[in-house]
């Protein structure tokens, strides 16, 4: 609802009388050129930007400088239509949706989101604040590049939003927006019924009783929120201590929380003359709503005031957050918007207040991750995406809520006893009693299921960096990709299969499960663990090395090693050490793990492990050190013969520094080592002498055989004769069994 406005026409460069002559005499108006520069918030504070003081109050320039303008995000508006001919609401981005169906009385309807005779300027003004173009003329909206879909209430702003609006019509209108793919719907439409008051909780219960147990338009709005859409509702302009029933609906239907946003309003002096957040504080923020300049039918602009003007600031800000975090769902994006808001003095909100809820959106803070985790929060970053959250992340609001829920539960138990409702409502209960009972039971059940600690789950193959100092109390799970902690976490971290923990920060504890990897540092660095750590069988501790440094884990508690592997790689390399890299590091020692509480257990292996070179671990009481050099494989273990084994044993005694020993250590495989042993054994020399002596008889025996053939008369008469004999042979050195040398030979 709007409480006042002033109008001014859209400025034009040419008067109507001179339009044709001026067009002939002057060149065409140049296309708008954006002066805003990436990384420079001040460059975005153009004259157009300054026409809406709400942009500066929410620090929208910080989002624009980060490249965030709402592009690609679909948002909706439920209001009194809009003027599609306004230059700032172009058809390329503003699209009306059509609500079609049959009213409760059987009359058919088909109503477009474009203005009709039943409408007023309200919807056009609200729509401009949502997303009017940034084109150098007039003003621009918060999410000036978003796609805006508009449904029509088919009424004006005086339309009362009590229980009487036709539920069939609103179901069709809300569903048309949801079917268009909008992620949030702005609801600034209508006025408060005169027969209700939101000043007290009893008054709110009475107002909600008008809707309870019957089909009303509120069911239509709630229906699309249960499909995942965020409904944004203005809180109302009457100055009550609480937001209206419609903006406070999750109080009565707790399952809607997370998909509902109530919005109160401020003036330029931080005054709040409108309905405060009250019972809606956990899903309520407060945005600029006084003297807001925006679009008007006919191409002009005007100032209007009220929470109707505040709500689209919040919806536009939510669209920017949605663009900033494409991997978050709607509820998560809303949580970022809420938890990065600030109180009126600019301080971050620890817990929402009855007056302003979470406070004023701070789009500068909202660009740097959530400010709090309000339960389990899963960040599912796809492969190839890397993001950084630099905000300190707490869960302090949950402490306040836990105390309030406990007090409310105790009060509800007293109510059940005092009213005799412990076994349910009596027959003949009034409408108000049925309403109160349903509200109390729903809220008590929701509180029983609520989580009062924030927790983070890193999922997906992408990478997330936490660089703030975070104090949320629940666990941190790494279920996929990389979570790099460069700030600090009070939370303990559990690394599951497919996940990797990195960073050079500090965490509360560490558990690496089978398939999980811990890779301390970003490149080479140290990860601190304030408590205990444990590596389970099948886990991996991935250590990067340079000539002078390595990754390291330093724990204040105990280290329990139940197996797993230590893998070695050069700094900034994804691959395990090559043999030549191992050779380059031979003789170096690295501290890779320290635990003040002691070390229990052993890793299974160090990889890579080449034939005679690799890494070995030295376990001390409170430290594990890595030595690069000779591994545990004996030279003789790859020998094929006793002679080779004898040579290998002799070389082993030479030790480091001897060129023969050092050369053998560089053998790439067993065959290479065996050839070296054979050459060093000298076996070939006596075997060769015997072989040559034995082979000399073959020529002698062949000549003798021919002579015997002649004496036996086998040769022919006087004719010339030829004679030849082919010889073939093979031979090899004997196996040298029992230390003897020899050979085997055969002639064919």
Q: What residue ranges belong to the model's regions?
A:
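Subtilisin-like serine protease catalytic core
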Residues: 32-41, 50-51, 61-166, 180, ...
């Amino acid at each position: 609802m709007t409480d006042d406005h002033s109008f001014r026409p859209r400025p034009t460069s040419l008067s109507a009388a001179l339009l044709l002559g001026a067009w002939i005499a002057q060149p065409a108006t140049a296309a708008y050129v954006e002066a805003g520069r990436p990384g420079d918030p001040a460059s975005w504070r153009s004259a157009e930007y300054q026409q809406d003081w709400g942009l500066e109050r929410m620090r929208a320039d910080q989002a624009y400088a980060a490249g965030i303008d709402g592009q690609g995000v679909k948002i909706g508006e439920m209001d009194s239509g809009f003027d599609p001919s306004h230059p700032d609401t172009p058809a390329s981005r503003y699209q009306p949706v059509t609500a079609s169906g049959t009213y409760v009385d059987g009359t058919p309807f088909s109503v477009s989101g474009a203005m009709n005779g039943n409408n007023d300027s309200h919807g056009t003004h609200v729509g401009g604040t949502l997303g009017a173009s940034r084109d150098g003329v007039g003003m621009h909206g918060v999410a000036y590049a978003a796609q805006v879909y508009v449904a029509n209430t088919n009424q004006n702003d005086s339309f009362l939003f009590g229980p009487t609006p036709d539920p069939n019509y609103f179901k069709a209108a809300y569903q048309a927006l949801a079917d268009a793919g909008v992620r949030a719907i702005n609801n600034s439409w209508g006025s408060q019924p005169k027969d209700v008051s939101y000043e007290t909780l009893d008054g709110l219960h009475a107002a909600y009783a008008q809707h309870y147990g019957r089909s009303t338009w509120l069911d239509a709005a709630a229906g699309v929120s249960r499909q995942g859409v965020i409904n944004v509702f203005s809180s109302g302009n009457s100055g009550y201590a609480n937001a209206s029933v419609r903006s406070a609906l999750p109080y009565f239907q707790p399952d809607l929380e997370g998909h509902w946003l109530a919005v109160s309003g401020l003036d330029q002096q931080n005054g709040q003359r409108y309905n405060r957040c009250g019972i809606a504080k956990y899903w309520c923020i407060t945005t600029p709503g006084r003297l807001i300049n925006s679009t008007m039918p006919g191409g002009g602009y005007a100032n209007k005031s009220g929470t109707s003007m505040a709500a689209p600031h919040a919806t536009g800000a939510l669209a920017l957050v949605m663009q900033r975090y494409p991997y978050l769902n709607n509820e998560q994006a809303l949580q970022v918007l809420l938890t990065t808001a600030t109180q009126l003095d600019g301080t971050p909100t620890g817990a929402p207040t009855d007056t302003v809820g979470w406070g004023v959106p701070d789009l500068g803070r909202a660009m740097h991750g959530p400010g709090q985790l309000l339960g389990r929060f899963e960040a599912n970053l796809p492969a190839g995406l890397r993001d950084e959250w630099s905000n300190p992340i707490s869960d302090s609001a949950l402490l306040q809520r836990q105390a309030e829920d406990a007090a409310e539960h105790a009060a509800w138990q007293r109510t059940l006893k005092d009213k005799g409702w412990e076994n349910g409502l009596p027959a003949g209960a009034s409408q108000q009693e049925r309403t109160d009972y349903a509200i109390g039971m729903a809220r008590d059940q929701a509180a029983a299921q609520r989580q009062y600690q924030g927790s983070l789950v890193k999922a997906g193959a992408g990478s997330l960096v936490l660089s703030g100092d975070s104090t949320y109390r629940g666990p941190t799970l790494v279920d996929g990709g990389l979570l790099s902690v460069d700030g600090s976490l009070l939370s303990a971290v559990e690394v599951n299969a497919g996940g990797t923990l990195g960073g050079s920060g500090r965490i509360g504890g560490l558990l690496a499960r089978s398939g999980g990897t811990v890779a301390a540092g970003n490149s080479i660095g140290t990860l601190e663990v304030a408590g205990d750590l444990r590596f389970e069988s099948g886990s991996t501790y991935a250590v990067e090395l340079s000539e002078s440094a390595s990754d390291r884990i330093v724990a204040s508690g105990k280290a329990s090693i139940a197996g797993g592997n230590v893998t070695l790689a050069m700094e900034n390399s994804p691959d395990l050490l090559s043999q030549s890299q191992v050779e380059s590091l031979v003789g170096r020692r690295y501290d890779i793990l320290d635990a003040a509480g002691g070390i229990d257990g052993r890793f299974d292996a160090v990889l890579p492990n080449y034939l005679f070179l690799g890494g070995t671990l030295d376990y001390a009481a409170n430290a594990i050190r890595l030595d690069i050099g000779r591994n545990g494989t004996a030279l003789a273990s790859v020998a094929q013969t006793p002679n080779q084994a004898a040579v290998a044993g002799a070389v082993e005694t030479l030790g480091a520094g001897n060129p023969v020993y050092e050369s053998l250590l560089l053998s790439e495989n067993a065959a290479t080592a065996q050839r070296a042993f054979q050459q060093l054994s000298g076996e070939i020399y006596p075997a060769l002498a015997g072989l040559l002596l034995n082979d000399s008889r073959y020529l002698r025996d062949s000549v003798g055989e021919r002579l015997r053939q002649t004496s036996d008369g086998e040769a022919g008469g006087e004719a010339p004769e030829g004679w030849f004999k082919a010889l073939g042979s093979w031979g090899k050195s004997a196996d040298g069994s029992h230390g003897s040398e020899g050979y085997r030979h055969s002639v064919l």
